[in-house]
């Protein structure tokens, strides 16, 4: 081999060494970079992460009871007001103002209502007529961490309030200060004339130093679709539903396609407030549950609020649902037939807790 060939071979060897060293350096840099990043993929290039990040987050101003935007009282406790629904108490003051109206039977088949407000500022200048508490309504309010407003109560209701430390404002204790008797409805008994006001409730909560912020770990009670993406229940069309609580009280809700709401009729006549406005809601929710007597001379009933079946109506259609509450502290939850949490259309709701024995008398048309 000539000296020229030996020199060329030597130069080639040096070149190979340099190339190998460079490649080794690149590999080391890559390994160090991966180690420092924890071996995680770049979320900006991961298609799965990209899909997840594109999911819209719930806006901070969504009302927990209606699902409507523009809510200004985030973090505040709802207010639950017990309302009289016997014949002499109608028409009620403020009937069309609650976010949710819950109705259930009491003694002798008479129904009582629980009006739920997500914000104290939604309560009108006059709300009533107020009535005494029943333990089932205490449990519903308790599950929502709501402040409970009532005028008197059964012994079972007072036991529930006392034993479980439910925050309440009671007209029996504060008549003339935060609770009043209407002076114009002189044609009905005095127990049908009780009312309160937004200002009076506000003053009462301040005087009694009642907690106004929701408790730690609080979860919103209901799921809603967005206002821009309304849903139609999957069970079929429903322009009207008839429900029966007892021989004393029955309702029908008739769908108005013009405004997308269900109009409430009670005992064959429009259910209107003191100003003549008919109650109308976006969502009608019927829950069936066993109802039994407490077994004493009081005539009080007990609604088994463990859970059961029901019907959901909205946008002119219906579907079968299930529901669950469980214990007194537990929140009422609604589920679709497939077991997923029921998603409501944003708007006001009516929840009727109907005795199971009356389920067969429900008529959907």
Feature names for model-found ranges:
Residues 19-31:
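Hydrophobic membrane-insertion alpha-helices, especially the h-region
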Residues 1-15:
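N-terminal Lys/Arg-rich, disordered targeting/topogenic segments
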Residues 30-43:
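Hydrophobic single-pass membrane-insertion segments
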Residues 47-98, 107-365:
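A surface/extracellular/periplasmic glyco- and lipid-processing/surface-interacting theme
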């Amino acid at each position: 081999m000539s000296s020229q060939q030996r020199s060329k071979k030597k130069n080639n060897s040096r070149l190979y060494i340099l190339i190998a060293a460079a490649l080794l350096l690149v590999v080391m840099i890559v390994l160090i970079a991966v180690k420092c990043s924890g071996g995680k993929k770049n979320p900006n290039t991961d298609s799965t992460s990209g899909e997840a990040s594109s999911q819209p987050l719930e806006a901070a101003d969504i009302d927990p009871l209606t699902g409507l935007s523009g809510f200004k009282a985030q973090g505040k406790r709802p207010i639950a007001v017990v309302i009289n629904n016997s014949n002499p108490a109608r028409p009620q003051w403020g009937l069309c103002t609650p976010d949710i109206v819950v109705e259930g039977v009491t003694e002798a088949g008479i129904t009582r209502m629980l009006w739920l407000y997500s914000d104290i500022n939604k309560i009108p200048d006059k709300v009533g007529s107020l009535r005494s508490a029943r333990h089932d309504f205490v449990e519903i309010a308790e599950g929502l961490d709501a402040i409970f407003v009532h005028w008197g109560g059964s012994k079972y209701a007072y036991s529930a309030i006392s034993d479980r430390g439910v925050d309440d404002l009671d007209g029996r204790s504060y008549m003339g200060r935060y609770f009043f008797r209407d002076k114009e409805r002189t044609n009905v008994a005095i127990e049908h004339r009780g009312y309160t006001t937004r200002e009076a409730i506000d003053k009462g909560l301040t005087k009694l130093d009642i907690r106004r912020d929701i408790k730690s770990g609080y979860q919103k009670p209901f799921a809603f679709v967005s206002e821009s993406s309304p849903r139609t229940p999957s069970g079929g069309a429903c322009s009207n539903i008839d429900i029966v609580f007892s021989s004393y009280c029955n309702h029908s809700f008739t769908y108005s396609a013009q405004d997308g709401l269900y109009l409430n009729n009670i005992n064959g006549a429009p259910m209107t407030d003191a100003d003549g406005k008919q109650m109308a809601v976006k969502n009608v929710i019927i829950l069936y549950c066993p109802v039994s007597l407490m077994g004493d001379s009081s005539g009080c009933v007990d609604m088994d609020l463990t859970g059961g079946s029901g019907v959901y109506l909205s946008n002119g259609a219906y579907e079968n649902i299930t529901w669950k509450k469980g214990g007194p502290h537990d929140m009422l939850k609604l589920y679709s037939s497939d077991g997923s949490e029921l998603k409501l259309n944003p708007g006001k709701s009516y929840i009727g807790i109907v005795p199971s024995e009356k389920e067969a008398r429900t008529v959907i048309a």
